[in-house]
């Protein structure tokens, strides 16, 4: 089974999420860091590698919270949440041409179709609401 993973980075100091603008080859849509898990990698190892490739960043003390596991035929996509103290400036690779930190429910447009579906899934919204309410107490 093919697996991919993505991550919502949330800055506790600004209460904003990181989104990445994919390049022309990737349809100029906004998404989150992540990508394909390679053979021999664990889910977390693959997600860490993808973040370092795409952002040159992955927090050493990351506490990853699973948000969603989506299965479609021979493909599984895992979505995680990670609260960090402060925003950072990502050093983007050639897959992306921009980034933006935006507030909850203030998504940049157009969203990648897969991320659009994830964000609009009620269970995902409820999990994010619960996580944010715990953090913001």
Predicted regions span which residues?
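Unchanged
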Residues: 35-124, 135-136
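Short intrinsically disordered terminal tails
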Residues: 1, 136-137
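Short beta-strand
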Residues: 21-22, 69
């Amino acid at each position: 089974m093919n697996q991919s993973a993505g991550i919502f980075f949330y800055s506790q100091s600004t209460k904003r999420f990181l989104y990445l603008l994919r390049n022309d080859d990737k349809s100029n849509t906004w998404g989150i860091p992540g990508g394909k898990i390679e053979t021999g990698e664990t889910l977390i190892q693959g997600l860490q590698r993808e973040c370092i490739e795409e952002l040159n960043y992955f927090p050493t003390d990351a506490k990853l919270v699973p948000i969603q596991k989506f299965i479609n035929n021979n493909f599984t996509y895992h979505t995680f949440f990670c609260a960090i103290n402060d925003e950072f400036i990502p050093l983007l690779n050639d897959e992306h041409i921009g980034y933006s930190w935006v507030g909850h429910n203030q998504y940049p447009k157009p969203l990648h179709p897969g991320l659009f579906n994830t964000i609009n899934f009620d269970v995902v919204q409820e999990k994010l609401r619960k996580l944010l309410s715990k953090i913001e107490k």
